[in-house]
Amino acid sequence: MKKALVFLADGCEMCEALCVVDVLRRAGINVFTAGVTGERVVSSHNVEIKADVMLSEVKNEEWDLVFAPGGMPGATNLASSSIVNSIILDTYNKGNIVSAICASPAVVFGPLGIIKSGKATCYPGCEDYAPGIEFVSDGVIVDGNVVTAKSAGWAFDLGLKLISLLEG
């Protein structure tokens, strides 16, 4: 069974996170939500959720997919976590799927050097967080093992794309 990790940090966009979690779980993917800023996470719109695990509990596991939802300051909270960055880079370097939506492609993935210009999308206005990278306006983009999506309106399509990539 494929295994996915979804990062949850205070200030994240919960509809992006939970839409992807729901779609992946319906497809039989073993999904873990991991609290980065605490076991209970409060979204950018004050929705509170309890993560399945704390990030520190699963930091040494191997993942078929890791996913960073957007939202502010959720994306900056993810980007400031050395454990999040390490898991993303480890997953990417193993050739497994790394995915981000909304602000996170620019804020989280941009500084890690895993996005190529013209081969990623992000929420309009977040491009400045990743100087030197040209983002495109498409809804969902796959570039090798990096999958990015533009905004909450694309979360369902992103989830379906991730299933097709994981399950072939």
PLM features: residue spans?
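Active-site-adjacent pocket-lining segments in enzyme domains
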Residues: 3-12, 26-36, 52-168
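Histidine-anchored nucleotide/phosphate-binding helix
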Residues: 19-21
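Membrane-interfacial amphipathic helices and adjacent loop/beta segments
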Residues: 34, 39-45
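Short gly/ser/thr-rich secondary-structure transition/capping motifs
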Residues: 45-53
